[in-house]
Swiss-Prot record:
GO MF terms, alphabetically ordered: transmembrane transporter activity
Family indicated by similarity: Belongs to the major facilitator superfamily. TCR/Tet family.
Induction of the gene: Expression is positively controlled by the cluster-specific regulator ATEG_00326.
Entry annotated with the keyword Lipid metabolism: no
Transmembrane intervals: 40-60, 71-91, 102-122, 132-152, 179-199, 206-228, 233-255, 324-344, 354-374, 380-400, 417-437, 493-513
Keywords from the named record: Glycoprotein, Membrane, Signal, Transmembrane, Transmembrane helix, Transport
Pfam family for this entry, one: MFS_1
Protein's cellular compartments: Membrane
Origin species: Aspergillus terreus (strain NIH 2624 / FGSC A1156)
Signal peptide annotation: 1-18
Gene Ontology CC terms, in alphabetical order: plasma membrane
PANTHER family to which the protein is assigned, alphabetical: DRUG TRANSPORTER, PUTATIVE (AFU_ORTHOLOGUE AFUA_3G08530)-RELATED, MAJOR FACILITATOR SUPERFAMILY
Full protein name: MFS-type transporter ATEG_00331
UniProt-annotated glycosylation sites, renumbered to this chain: 165, 178, 524
Length: 551
């Protein structure tokens, strides 16, 4: 009972963070119209949450190593709450993006630390069962997020996508859905964590702990990630791909991220309390790569664009219905995640679910290439079910594989590795998808301008493709059919790209080391003394390895 209360507190925390990744998918068009955004700004409505969620994961993990999991998780929930408040009060796109950035910073800590706590508390065999529960929580958030976001946009306002995380909603807000004026989602999550999360919490002095942090490494990770994704987002849209701005952002974004170089990842260099001190053996690289491709495949093609695209295929359906379109993949994902957790808990083997998930991802998302510019419901539902069967097992299996190969002191760093890879891939997925789609649709400018007005043609091909759905539905049948066909062709390029990435992940997964998970476990401890002992142990190993090489 105690274990399930603990997991319940983590699940609710995970739910609010995961919900904000998907609730925007059906609200983005309303936000774009309300705040008058360009296509590039539209893309950053989603990326502004996902980017800091990825970049903040390593420092959140290191802070929890120093100060303990519970207080740092509580702080991340508070940060998430503040970001939600700013987003709800946004009067322009800059303020909204600022709120999403703060939200994402807190969300990155919530998701990463929830997984870390399970790794601390439970044995390798038991972890899989509870990670399955977290996977179901994420799946429920995936399913409810677009529906709730669409309902808010249709009946109240997109701002309620942010008010929902407050401990109270404004009394003056319209309430046709008969929702209560008190929605204590973030508040209840924080209270449950405070009451039921019983883990080792060291008494680390605040100043000493902060001085032990690798702030230079933290700034490097955040700065490099932002530069890289800005370069990808600007390429071909705001600036030409060969412009100095785009080239410099991408090159320096990759080059400056020294803290995550492979030599550091493999433990050949050990830094004092580094922001990403993942001294883990090389065999974990394929699981991290699988998690990366999983994140890259998940968000854009499965959760972000289909609601908007499918709504264009129908006769102006309500926005709440476009979220229902995602239920097949969300429900199947939950079932697959639960089954995977039970299988790993029973057998102790994590490689078969990874292989199965990647094969189904290739099949399911490869079938998306066959989607038509009209509502072919048999295709839409069956293809999503197959994709969900592939996505579900990959929520927990890669992190279980990594935890099985790491020391207890490196649990947070291992979780940070997986979630950094997954979150940065999710953010990159939106950027990659936007770049591929926008550049492809621009190639059809001559076709489109022959059937629609020059103004609408320019809107569709020069930055407003996603926000032009109302104008497209108002076109004559022949013109509407041509534009939808070009939309579908542009999206097909995305499906091909993501399917190829899934194949690359399957090839990498072959190199995952084979182990049978143990049922034995000892509670992990945190604090500077534990981290220092682990660091000295790594240094001693390096000295012995160097001496052996010298001989």
């Amino acid at each position: 009972m105690k274990a399930w209360l603990l997991v319940s507190s983590l699940c609710l925390s995970t739910f609010i963070a995961a919900l904000e990744q998907t609730i925007i998918s059906t609200a983005a068009e309303s936000i774009s119209r309300s705040l008058h955004t360009t296509e590039l700004e539209f893309t950053w409505i989603g990326t502004a949450y996902l980017l800091p969620a990825a970049a903040s994961t390593p420092p959140w993990g290191k802070l929890s190593d120093i100060f303990g999991r519970k207080p740092v998780l509580m702080i991340s929930i508070v940060v998430f709450f503040i970001g939600s408040l700013i987003g709800a009060l946004a009067i322009n796109i800059d303020m909204l993006i600022a709120g999403r950035v703060i939200q994402g910073t807190g969300g990155g800590g919530i998701l990463g630390l929830s997984a870390t706590v399970i790794g601390d508390v439970f044995s390798p065999r038991e972890r899989s069962k509870y990670y399955g529960v977290l996977g179901v929580t994420w799946g429920v958030a995936c399913g409810l997020g677009p529906i709730v976001g669409g309902a808010f946009c249709q009946y109240v306002s997109w701002r309620w996508c942010f008010w929902i995380n407050r401990t109270s909603l404004p009394q003056s807000s319209p309430n046709p859905l008969n929702l209560t004026t008190s929605v204590p989602v973030a508040g209840v999550a924080g209270a449950l964590v405070l009451l039921f999360l019983e883990v080792h919490t060291p008494r680390t002095p605040i100043i000493e702990g902060l001085l032990a942090m690798d702030w230079l490494g933290t700034i490097t990770i955040v700065g490099a990630t932002v530069m890289f994704l800005l370069g990808l987002g600007y390429g071909g849209i705001a600036y030409p791909w060969n412009s100095a701005t785009v080239v410099c952002l991408i090159v320096f974004g990759i080059g400056d991220n020294r803290r995550l170089r492979p030599d550091r990842m493999e433990g050949r260099q050990v830094l004092d309390h580094a922001a990403a001190p993942v001294q883990i053996p090389p065999p974990i690289s394929p699981p991290s790569a699988s998690a990366y491709i999983h994140g890259l495949r998940l968000h854009r093609p499965t959760l972000y664009y289909p609601p908007a695209v499918l709504s264009r295929s129908c006769s102006a359906p309500p926005r709440s219905l476009s979220g229902v379109y995602l239920l097949p993949v969300a429900v199947t994902l939950c079932v697959a995640s639960t089954a995977t957790g039970l299988y790993i808990s029973h057998s102790g083997r994590y490689r078969p679910p990874i292989y199965f998930g990647l094969v189904m991802m290739i099949l399911g998302h490869g079938l998306y290439i066959n989607l038509q510019p009209y509502a072919s419901w048999a295709r839409i539902i069956i293809f999503q079910i197959i994709a969900g069967l592939g996505l579900g097992p990959l929520f927990q299996a890669p992190i279980i594989a990594i935890f099985s190969l790491t020391k207890p002191a490196d649990t947070a760093s291992a979780a940070a590795t997986v979630f950094f890879a997954r979150d940065i891939a999710t953010a990159m997925s939106i950027v990659f998808g936007g770049v591929i789609f926008q550049n492809r649709i621009r190639a059809f400018k001559s076709d489109i301008e022959g059937v629609v007005s020059p103004e609408l043609t320019e809107l569709i091909t020069s930055g407003g493709a996603t926000t032009a759905s109302d104008q497209i539905r108002a076109l004559p049948a022949a013109a509407r059919s041509l534009v939808r066909d070009r939309y579908n062709t542009a999206l097909r390029s995305e499906w091909i790209f993501y399917t190829a990435l899934s194949g690359a992940a399957l090839l990498l997964s072959v190199f995952i080391s084979k182990q049978v998970l143990s049922r034995d476990h000892k509670m992990n401890k945190t604090g500077l003394d534990v981290q220092e002992a682990s660091r000295l142990e790594e240094l001693e190993k390096e000295k012995k390895a160097a001496a052996t090489d010298a001989v």
